[in-house]
Amino acid sequence: MSEINQQAKSAHHAQLRFVALVLVIGLSRHLPLSHPEWSNFSPVLALFLLSGAHLRGFWSWTTPLCAILVTDLIINPSYGVSLLEPFMLITVLSYLLVFLVGKKISGTRSLARLVGGGILGALLFHFLTCGFAWCINPAYAKSFNGLIQALTIGQPGFPPAYLFLRNTMVSTIIFTAVLGWIALRLKEPVSPTTGKASTASTS
């Protein structure tokens, strides 16, 4: 019984540590503000994916959402952007879909599968946000060619959309790999005899 209690306590502490990690990184997600060419390079998608995959219950969705909303409340006014604007709402919807991808692979101990989920999440985010921009922006022709323009080169006078996809993809892969490895290490059971954790699978 004591061994079971020890494992339950260890799992609870691991979840609290991961929650703290998600909050800290979420609150620092706008690091490249002074470098427009690195727009969308952020840990946000990795946070939602891994929260869905590794957190349980109330914490699983409130942790990343709070981290995102707090930073948006602080930063968005400097851009003149409201949290209730349609594009912000579709962005939050995209985050929640990435969270559901994480839920779908919850329980996995494969780092490769987590990274694969991150790649899928980055593609979902790009297609949803750029597709929505195509729908509401009169600068895009409402045709197949206009949709392709929104997904690739974007609106003239602005950075190309493929640059956003590149940054989203690269940052999501990096943060998913690093944070996923940390999450797997935190969840490893500790042997009561050796005091050491077993090694997580990376395949």
Protein language model annotation of sequence segments:
Residues 21, 60-71, 114-122, 179, ...:
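Central hydrophobic cores of alpha-helical transmembrane segments
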Residues 27-31, 50-58, 97-108, 182-190:
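Structural signal for the C-terminal ends of transmembrane alpha-helices
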Residues 109-193:
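Membrane-embedded alpha-helical hairpins and interfacial helices in multi-pass inner-membrane proteins
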Residues 81-126, 180:
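Short helix-perturbing small/polar motifs within transmembrane alpha-helices
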Residues 30-36, 77-86, 104-108, 162:
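Membrane-interface helix caps and helix-loop-helix hairpins in membrane proteins
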Residues 23-31, 66-78, 122-131:
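Aromatic-anchored segments of alpha-helical transmembrane domains
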Residues 2-62:
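Hydrophobic transmembrane alpha-helices
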Residues 38-101:
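Alpha-helical membrane segments and adjacent membrane-interface helices in multi-pass membrane proteins
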